[in-house]
């Protein structure tokens, strides 16, 4: 019987599953390409830091994980994307250990009125100091 060491793994929070889950070099049939699998939480880390320009601390908080775990996820994601771009591999996005963040706060989920899940009553997140 195997026992897991350390703390139990908690699901990472993501804003939503991506609409597009496969990217490949143009002009080459997918069957001929190697693929690199990018998990949903790896894509979320790239989205928060590289696309939305959030500091690592804020991005880690948004995903509900420590900065160290966040950094490891981000480093893995960047390596996989770089490998796929440089070596002409297909990027397959899927899987991972995640949970979709509740859509109650516009500042957290950043969907607001454009929510693809049809939620139209997002509220602004109130800080403790307010």
Swiss-Prot record:
Family annotation (Pfam families): DUF134
InterPro entries attached to this UniProt entry: UPF0251
HAMAP family xref list: UPF0251
Family per record: Belongs to the UPF0251 family.
Protein name from the UniProt record: UPF0251 protein MmarC5_0986
């Amino acid at each position: 019987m195997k026992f897991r060491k350390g703390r139990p793994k908690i699901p990472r929070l993501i804003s939503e599953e991506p609409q597009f889950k496969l990217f490949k070099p143009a002009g080459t049939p997918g069957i001929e390409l190697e693929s690199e699998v990018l998990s949903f939480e790896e894509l979320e880390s790239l989205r928060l830091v590289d696309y939305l320009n959030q500091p690592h601390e804020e991005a880690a908080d948004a995903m509900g994980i420590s900065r160290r775990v966040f950094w490891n996820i981000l480093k893995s994601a960047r390596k996989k994307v770089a490998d796929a771009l440089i070596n002409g591999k297909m990027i397959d996005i899927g899987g991972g250990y995640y949970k979709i963040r509740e859509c109650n706060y516009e500042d957290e989920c950043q969907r607001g009125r454009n929510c693809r899940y049809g939620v139209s009553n997002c509220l602004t997140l109130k800080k403790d100091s307010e």
